């Protein structure tokens, strides 16, 4: 917040999501459990599993308040990524922030999904275009090696690192 950042939009799948809701965004465990117990009021029932629900909160940091939002995530692995990027881009446009200095997109991936889902390459390919630029995205990749059902790691992808798909793209860190 002290550097001018006043928000972050987070996209992630199910693994670790409840932890992020409670420990990073400050959702009260009793509220989370009430959703699972079906005792929490639902204004508009989504019909989706509870751990796919989104949430946002204002978190106090030493530099000031920061608004964090965790995007709703459907059961389609990695599809939340362009949604988060679009949300951040819309906020940039609304705030007249052409360099993306106020809201940070953060995406959390599993290693297999990062390398294996085409939506990631598509999102990366658009990252530097004028209509989709967000100033940069933090990608957190969990190398848990459980995304594929193959027994030999040599059969999971063609490269040593799941992040090697990023070598196709360049970025100007000075922006």
Map each language-model feature to its residues.
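Conserved internal helical-beta-strand scaffold that buttresses enzyme catalytic cores
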Residues: 1-158
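Short, surface-exposed alpha-helical segments at coil->helix boundaries
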Residues: 159-163
């Amino acid at each position: 917040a002290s550097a001018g950042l006043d928000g972050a939009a987070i996209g992630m799948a199910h693994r670790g999501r409840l932890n992020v809701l409670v420990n990073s965004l400050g959702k009260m465990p009793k509220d989370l459990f009430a959703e699972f117990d079906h005792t929490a009021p639902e204004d508009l029932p989504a019909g989706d599993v509870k751990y796919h629900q989104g949430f946002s909160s204002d978190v106090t940091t030493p530099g000031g308040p920061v608004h964090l939002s965790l995007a709703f995530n459907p059961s389609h692995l990695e599809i939340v990524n362009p949604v988060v990027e679009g949300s951040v881009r819309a906020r940039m446009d609304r705030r007249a922030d052409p360099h993306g200095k106020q809201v940070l997109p953060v995406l959390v991936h599993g290693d297999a999904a990062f390398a294996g889902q085409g939506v990631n390459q598509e999102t990366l390919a658009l990252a530097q275009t004028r209509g989709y630029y967000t100033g940069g995205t933090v990608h957190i990749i969990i190398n848990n090696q459980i995304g594929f059902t193959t027994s030999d790691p040599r059969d999971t992808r063609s490269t040593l690192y799941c992040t090697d798909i990023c070598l196709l793209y360049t970025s100007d860190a000075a922006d």
